[in-house]
Swiss-Prot record:
Domain PAC: from-to ranges: 230-284
Ranges of residues in domain PAS: 156-229
Organism encoding this protein: Halobacterium salinarum (strain ATCC 700922 / JCM 11081 / NRC-1)
Name by which UniProt lists this protein: Bacterioopsin transcriptional activator
One Pfam family matching this protein: BAT
Function: Involved in activating bop (bacterioopsin) and brp gene expression at low-oxygen tension, which naturally occurs in stationary phase.
């Protein structure tokens, strides 16, 4: 932690100042903590450690936070999100060293007080204005009376001596009037750190701690400060009495007599060997990360550009496979499409060393090491590494292959296999490839959605599924009721599906208790209940029906279940998609009857508007908005309160209201947008 002192001597007693916590390191280009501190309106404290800075926010002298956001350093947006967990309205100005859409979106979602890019013109002035507008100032006293002055002179002297003797850091005092600057005092901690007793140290110069591995430049820096009579801090390697080395952080300050002449030097020694070891380990990790970034940075940019230019799913698969397989970073790549109904993965595209794998089919119901790995990738939705011994297509002798799930929310579109000549792939590289898989999955979903929105007509399909094994049908029969779907929410972080339904059952808790007996139900609860109906939430570990419909690029617009039948209204963009939905449902379920099939003009419906808004909302914002709507939160009087809805999402009320407010803002903005 660094306390930055005001340089303006004009700051007078009673002047109003704003306590500013500067979280993170100073940007290489842009405003630094000292720049703000030069403004007499602010009292700036800089803390570079994330946890320590978060704890400091709670202190009463902190009125505002300036959080630096660096892509490979201090995560200022994550710090803002951490502050918002307990301080919904605390002023936090985020200063990113580089701004992209994700940083801006996260900052807005977390309700940042301000977002000031470090490289922007007059960034310091902009930050200062934001602070002054949002943070209250407090009055500073020039001097605080210390009760120790109530003691007698002798008692005060003894107390201070005891404090020096028992301080947890090494303390020495040297005589500055003697050319040799001999030590005249050491405390107990100095002996603990160095192993030297007072008899061995008093009268000696500090040089006895130095040795062959002591950095001479640091020693010169140390003695320059002493010669020029100013404070200094130096970290250097010193030797203990037993000859062992340790890293010693030495702080030296001159003490002046009544005439203004330096009479003594006080030194503070701290063994920072563990900290230095951690820093060296971190430096090694950063160097390793730099090598990784050099390798994949161009790849990620090219892949992102390719995904943006791709017009449809087929082009997405081709572009991503060609770039990864032939770009030079990896030996080869292939893209396998996942068919949830057939439980197979079929290689659709291959490039580089994997060329020739096109058409290979993996039956996930069969045996084999490669199949087992692919099963785990699909089920766990995590990247896994295989070797040539596993028999994965395109893996040469000695090569390794990363199998990356291509997913969007609860839907798995396929598996991306990346082959490399390096037998071991860094965990962080796997994380980056996993992110690439999610990005590709989102692009495929967008392509399917765009096709539905952009088409001249949309097709509405009505089907009836007479299958008592369907969850809602079976539950309706077991509880003698009916269900009407209000919302189905797929979580992008898990395979789970959150389903909200209404039921006229007079005992909704009995419905919940019955549902909890099903293997697929992870949790269930009554959200709100009235005399006429109740809203019930089911948290499902998976939903084969939802997976099938998502894979086909369709959207459920109505779902009704009774004890024998599930009535389903689905919207798709093309006749081909409609045929695929029907074929997939008939392959999956025994009795599927088509009861409606007609075209709609998108200009006559709000479908496109809803789809674009749905894609603009985050998962949490969409969930908060849907729950508020179906639970009667917007009615008067309210049928459900925000606290109750927050508990159903396992978040605090303030966070729920932030998500809801952001969703409402996007909804209203989309409605009034020209």
């Amino acid at each position: 932690m660094t306390s930055v002192q005001n340089t303006e001597s004009e700051t007078a007693a009673g002047a109003t100042t704003i306590g500013v916590l500067f979280a993170g390191s100073d940007p290489e280009t842009g405003p630094a903590a000292c720049d703000l501190d030069e403004d007499g309106r602010f009292d700036v404290t800089q803390i570079r450690d994330f946890v320590a800075a978060r704890d400091r926010v709670d202190d009463p002298d902190i009125d505002c936070v300036v959080a630096v956001h660096e892509p490979d350093g201090f995560d200022g947006v994550a710090f803002l999100e951490a502050v918002r967990q307990t301080h919904a309205e605390f002023p936090v100005v985020v200063v990113p060293t580089a701004v992209d859409e994700d940083v801006a979106r996260r900052a807005v979602d977390a309700d940042a007080t301000g977002l000031v890019p470090a490289v922007s013109e007059d960034a310091t002035a902009a930050i200062a204005d934001r602070i002054e507008q949002s943070a209250p100032a407090h009055s500073e006293d020039t001097e605080t009376r210390m009760p120790i002055s109530d003691l007698t002179v002798e008692s005060e002297r003894r107390l201070k001596e005891q404090a020096l003797d028992e301080a947890p850091i090494g303390i020495t005092i040297s005589d500055a009037t003697d050319p040799e600057e001999p030590i005249i005092y050491i405390n107990d901690s100095f002996e603990d750190i160095t192993g030297y007793s007072p008899d061995e140290v008093v009268g000696a110069n500090h040089r006895f701690l130095q040795g062959p591995k002591t950095n001479e430049d640091r020693v010169a820096e140390f003695w320059t400060a002493i010669t020029e009579d100013h404070d200094t801090q130096v970290v250097l390697r010193n030797y203990r009495r037993d000859g062992s080395l340790f890293w010693n952080q030495v702080d030296i300050s001159p003490i002046y007599d009544e005439d203004g002449t330096v009479s003594h030097y006080v030194g503070f020694q701290m063994d920072v060997s563990e900290r230095m070891a951690a820093q060296q380990e971190l430096q090694g990790e950063r160097q390793s990360l730099d090598r990784l970034l050099d390798r994949v940075n161009g790849l990620m940019n090219d892949v992102t550009s390719a995904l943006v230019r791709a017009a449809d799913r087929e082009e997405i698969e081709t572009r991503i496979t060609d770039r990864i397989g032939t770009g030079g970073e990896y030996a080869g790549a292939w893209f396998g499409r996942y068919d949830a109904t057939e439980d197979t993965i079929t290689v659709a595209e291959a490039a580089g060393d994997c060329e020739g794998c096109d058409g290979d089919v993996f039956d996930l119901a069969s045996a084999g090491e490669a199949v087992a790995l692919l099963q785990d990738v699909v089920e766990q939705r995590e990247a896994l590494v295989s070797t040539d011994a596993d028999g994965v297509s395109g893996t040469a002798d000695g090569d390794a292959c990363v199998l990356v799930p291509v997913t969007y929310r609860s839907t798995t579109y396929g598996v991306l296999a990346v082959s490399t000549a390096e037998h071991r792939i860094d965990d962080r590289e796997q994380v980056l490839l996993r992110s690439l898989g999610r990005t590709t999955g989102a692009s495929i979903n967008d392509a399917l959605t765009r096709r539905t929105i952009a088409t001249d007509t949309v097709l509405n399909i009505g089907v009836e599924l007479s299958d008592t094994a369907l969850f809602l049908v079976e539950l309706a029969g077991a509880t003698d009721t009916t269900f009407e779907q209000e919302a189905t929410i797929a979580d992008s972080q898990t395979q789970g599906v959150l389903m909200l339904v209404t039921t006229p059952h007079d005992d909704p808790q009995a419905v919940v208790d019955t549902a909890l007996g099903y293997d697929a139900v992870q949790d269930a609860e009554v959200i709100v209940s009235t005399d006429d109906e109740s809203v019930v939430q089911f948290d499902l570990s998976s939903s084969p029906l939802v997976d099938v419909l998502s894979e086909c690029g369709s959207r459920v617009i109505r779902m009704h279940a009774d004890r024998t039948t599930l009535e389903l209204d689905v919207r798709v963009g093309t006749e081909g998609a409609a045929r695929r939905v029907l074929s997939t449902l008939r392959d999956k379920y025994a009795d599927v009857e088509l009861v409606a099939y007609h075209e709609d003009d998108p200009e006559q419906t709000p479908h496109g508007f809803r789809e674009e808004l749905r894609n603009d909302l985050t998962d949490r914002q969409l969930t908060a908005l849907q729950k508020a709507y179906v639970s009667g939160y917007f009615e008067w009087p309210r049928r459900a309160e925000g606290k109750q809805l927050a508990e159903s999402m396992d978040i605090v009320p303030s966070t729920y209201h932030q998500h809801l407010q952001a969703a409402k803002q996007k909804l209203v903005g989309a409605f009034f947008e020209e």
